[in-house]
């Protein structure tokens, strides 16, 4: 049986509590973590949950200070992140870092084969022009620009849908997988996306493009997810009918609330417009008056 340790009053006075900007709670200094780059202080539990969420969702590799008003706009260093998270989460963080490095490096590209996913090196002198790339792992030969099979003396076919280069399609270098292939490419920016489980409505972390995982059709304007009510993707969203109805109710409610707010505010806007215009005209007239000599 454990008992609470008695601490004298003067000891408590010398151990002040520090406020966390995330949860607004107050904790002793030993339960707080200071970000080295900006010296902002948060409770260790909140900062740990914040870092883990960003890594699990894959939002960003440069994890910034959670304080939006941070004057130095600091970032957490890799050793600080490693002290907070579990080994498997840290491995995912390093994987995301590597993927971003390859994406931003013009001299490297990913092998387009869904069964390979190796990193291929381009010739440094011709990184801008389409060139033949040969994967050192699977020996696949493809075009560095369009990722299709190498086409010497032919231009890249810009009008060919990107879906023809994706797993599950009739491409010369992709295995004929089913619609549940774990890795596909964004139809807009061609970045590789891995889907573990969950909803079929995907959003590319690179270009923020929303699309259906199965048919790759754009969902940017489909706020009500009508796409999953018909066609080959019907009932493939991955959520129950009740949750879909609740989502649509929320979306309709938001639009209805915005419309109602605009309707209520419109008379006040109409009344205020003449006064605003008069004030602006008066100010501009005052600026045009010559200065007294």
From Swiss-Prot:
Residues holding Zn(2+) 3: 143, 146, 151, 156
GO-annotated cellular components: cytoplasm; Golgi apparatus; membrane; ubiquitin ligase complex
Classification via InterPro entries: E3_UB_ligase_RBR, IBR_dom, TRIAD_supradom, Znf_RING, Znf_RING/FYVE/PHD, Znf_RING_CS
Zinc finger (IBR-type): 91-156
Record has Transferase as a keyword: yes
EC id: 2.3.2.31
Alphabetical list of CDD domains matching this protein: BRcat_RBR_RNF144A, mRING-HC-C4C4_RBR_RNF144A, Rcat_RBR_RNF144
Ranges annotated as spanning the membrane: 251-271
Pathway where it operates: Protein modification; protein ubiquitination
Binding site residues for Zn(2+) 2: 111, 116, 135, 138
Uppermost EC category: transferase
Entry keywords, A to Z: Membrane, Metal-binding, Repeat, Transferase, Transmembrane, Transmembrane helix, Ubl conjugation pathway, Zinc, Zinc-finger
A Pfam family it matches: IBR_1
Disulfide bonding pattern of the chain: none
Molecular-function GO terms, alphabetical: ubiquitin conjugating enzyme binding; ubiquitin protein ligase activity; zinc ion binding
Record comment regarding domains: Members of the RBR family are atypical E3 ligases. They interact with the E2 conjugating enzyme UBE2L3 and function like HECT-type E3 enzymes: they bind E2s via the first RING domain, but require an obligate trans-thiolation step during the ubiquitin transfer, requiring a conserved cysteine residue in the second RING domain.
Protein purpose: E3 ubiquitin-protein ligase which accepts ubiquitin from E2 ubiquitin-conjugating enzymes ube2l3 and ube2l6 in the form of a thioester and then directly transfers the ubiquitin to targeted substrates.
Protein name: Probable E3 ubiquitin-protein ligase RNF144A-A
UniProt gene name: rnf144aa
